[in-house]
């Protein structure tokens, strides 16, 4: 079983501008998810230790177990009220730490060592661990929005339907067949698209009710580009609104057609594509519980689902 760990670094305090010179050194916990991506935990730890030292930072390793414990470690780290808490991992790890940090004065530092690293990419944080470590000591703090569904935070997106089914099947393939995350996701996508089903939902958007039968509902923390070669990216994370996307199309051919609309920059012109920008969304279903994927992590949640945006509730160090 891979191990994960917490590092402690000595860095300067964080402000909503350029970081000051480290005149008063503080201990800052850095959470490392040794299971992110396809790397091995021990090798990854050694690489990160070297990257931190090249950045002039002094790490100390605190081992911890996998899963939800990352939130407990983050809470314990916050007891000392550090100015910066650094998370090294994928979007799931960052999301868990952000869930603890939101609404506090502690800033999130990001070392993106996961598989997709969407949050880091959208904020312009280097994907190289050494360069990202430099940012932690020399960058600036900004405030970004955090999404929430039934009290659970997400920094990128939350979705139900097709993608949640894909995550469930991906996790099963990783567990049973020991496939890599990327390979398992590809096989899961092929399986789900071949058997896609609709969800009977009642959406309350901006005080209006929308009855729909949809293969998915995608809720983004801010607006996602849905067209062309920048599809799936965000130009800002402080717009103060959730962006909700869904379609009435179902079946593999219908979804492929939707994807082609996106590729040619015509997604918003597709007849069955729907989008709303709102601070709050309520999703009702005949089902007592629904599977919801939040930043790639699967959760079974009681209905109705209450989605909210928490504007500028998270401080993050960026270049």
Placement of each model-derived feature along the sequence:
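ATP/NTP phosphate-donor binding region
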Residues: 3-85, 95, 131
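ATP/nucleoside-binding phosphotransfer catalytic cores, i.e., glycine-rich phosphate-binding loops
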Residues: 16, 41, 205, 236, ...
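Catalytic core of DAGKc-family lipid kinases
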Residues: 22-24, 46, 54-55, 64, ...
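Glycine-rich beta-strand-to-loop/alpha-helix junction loops that act as flexible
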Residues: 34, 88-90, 111-113
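Short hydrophobic-aromatic micro-motifs
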Residues: 152-161, 165, 211-212, 216-220, ...
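Gly/Ser/Thr-rich active-site loops/lids in small-molecule metabolic enzymes
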Residues: 174-183, 219, 225-254
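A generic structural signal for short beta-strands and their flanking turns/coil linkers
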Residues: 197-199, 213-215, 238-243, 277-281
């Amino acid at each position: 079983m891979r191990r994960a760990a917490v590092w402690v670094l000595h860095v300067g305090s964080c402000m909503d501008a350029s970081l000051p010179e480290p005149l008063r050194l503080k201990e800052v916990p850095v959470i490392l998810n040794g299971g992110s991506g396809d790397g091995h935990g021990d090798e990854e730890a050694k690489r990160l230790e070297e990257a931190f030292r090249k950045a002039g930072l002094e790490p100390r390793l605190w081992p911890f177990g996998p899963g939800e414990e990352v939130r407990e470690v983050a809470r314990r780290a916050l007891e000392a009220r550090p100015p910066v808490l650094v998370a090294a991992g994928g979007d799931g790890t960052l999301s868990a730490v952000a869930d603890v940090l939101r609404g506090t004065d502690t800033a999130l530092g990001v070392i993106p060592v996961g598989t997709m690293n969407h949050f880091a990419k959208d904020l312009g944080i280097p994907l190289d661990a050494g360069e990202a470590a430099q940012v932690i000591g020399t960058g600036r703090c900004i405030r970004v929005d955090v999404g929430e569904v039934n009290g659970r935070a997400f920094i990128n997106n939350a979705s139900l339907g097709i993608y949640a089914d894909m995550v469930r099947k991906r996790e099963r393939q990783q567990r049973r067949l020991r496939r890599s995350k990327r390979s398992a996701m590809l096989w899961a996508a092929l399986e789900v698209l071949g058997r896609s089903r609709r969800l009977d939902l009642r959406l309350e958007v901006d005080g209006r009710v929308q009855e729909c039968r949809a293969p998915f509902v995608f809720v983004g923390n801010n607006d996602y580009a849905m067209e062309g070669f920048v599809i799936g990216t965000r130009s800002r994370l402080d717009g103060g609104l959730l962006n909700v996307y869904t379609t009435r199309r179902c079946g593999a051919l219908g979804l492929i057609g939707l994807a082609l609309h996106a590729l040619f920059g015509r997604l918003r012109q597709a007849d069955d594509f729907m989008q709303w920008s709102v601070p709050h969304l309520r999703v009702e279903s005949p089902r007592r519980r629904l599977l919801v994927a939040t930043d790639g992590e699967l959760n079974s949640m009681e209905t109705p689902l209450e989605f909210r945006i928490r504007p500028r509730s998270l401080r993050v160090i960026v270049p």
